[in-house]
């Protein structure tokens, strides 16, 4: 979907940066988004199913427990 692409583009532009759900909602959905904050989780899960070899053990889009999500830095992927 367009939102999944926007999420992937944002993560790829800033690898290693942790984004909170609020950061992602503000940036991708806009300040006027009145939906459920966990809609981010659904989009992340769908995106992982498309780009990860094993979405249950993500390498690229990582969960930072209690904070949000981050995209792995290139050096992490080659280690």
Regions found by a protein language model. Name each.
Residues 1-42, 46-67:
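Positively charged, aromatic-enriched patches within helix-turn-helix-type DNA-binding elements
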Residues 49, 53, 71-79:
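Intrinsically disordered, low-complexity protein-interaction/activation regions
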